[in-house]
């Protein structure tokens, strides 16, 4: 199976951005200087205003992307962003230390800044992540975007393949770390109907 570089720019499913449920999120990302809206403007093949028969409060713009071009454009953007270093590895474990290892004043400031988490009733400080290969990346905070990859499996008819979408590797170890940190896990099932080749 492949471990595709820069998976964060991939659009493996329905390649649209915006719409009724996610349009506000795209606008918030745009307001914060993010690239999603900018890149869809460069690569869309169709855009449509949804809910036009209703009031303006529920109007919502949705753009259909050329998913290959969107991926290439986003990858270019990421690779040319100053002060951004891209490392790729499968994370197996979130590393934390007890909050009481810092003095009380520091711990209080860090909790306010969102760098502290409560794990099994005890305040913990996130210090990094450990990869499957044993590498450690130290950090002050983690943004966790697992998508559909945690212990992923694809069902094709009666056949079960333990893999992520489109043959990409699943993240098979991170789930245990999240559970050990007191995070409750649920499995969601999505379905894609068979495509008819014209």
Locate each region found by the language model.
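Glycine-rich loop(s) and the adjacent beta-strand/alpha-helix scaffold that form part
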Residues: 144-196
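Conserved N-terminal glycine-rich FAD pyrophosphate-binding loop of Rossmann-like flavoproteins
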Residues: 8-30, 157
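Glycine-/proline-rich flexible loop or hinge segments
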Residues: 9-14, 51-61, 157-160
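Short, small-residue-biased leader/transition segments that mark boundaries at the very start
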Residues: 2-7
């Amino acid at each position: 199976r492949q471990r595709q570089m820069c998976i964060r720019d991939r659009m493996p499913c329905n390649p649209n951005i915006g719409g009724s449920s996610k349009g506000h999120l795209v606008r918030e990302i745009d307001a914060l200087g993010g690239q999603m809206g900018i890149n869809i403007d460069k690569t869309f093949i169709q855009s449509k205003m949804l809910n036009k028969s209703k009031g303006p409060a529920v109007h919502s713009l949705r753009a259909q992307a050329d998913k290959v071009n969107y991926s290439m454009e986003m990858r270019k953007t990421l690779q040319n962003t100053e002060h951004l270093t891209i490392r790729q590895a499968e994370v197996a474990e979130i590393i934390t230390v007890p909050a009481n290892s810092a003095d009380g004043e520091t711990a209080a400031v860090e909790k306010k800044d969102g760098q502290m988490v409560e794990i099994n009733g005890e305040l913990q400080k996130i210090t990094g992540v450990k990869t499957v290969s044993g590498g450690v990346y130290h950090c002050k905070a983690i943004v966790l975007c697992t998508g559909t990859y945690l212990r992923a499996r694809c069902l094709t008819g009666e056949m079960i393949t333990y893999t992520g979408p489109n043959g990409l590797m699943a993240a098979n170890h991170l789930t245990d770390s999240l559970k050990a940190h007191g995070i409750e896990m649920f499995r969601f099932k999505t379905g894609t109907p068979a495509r008819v080749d014209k």
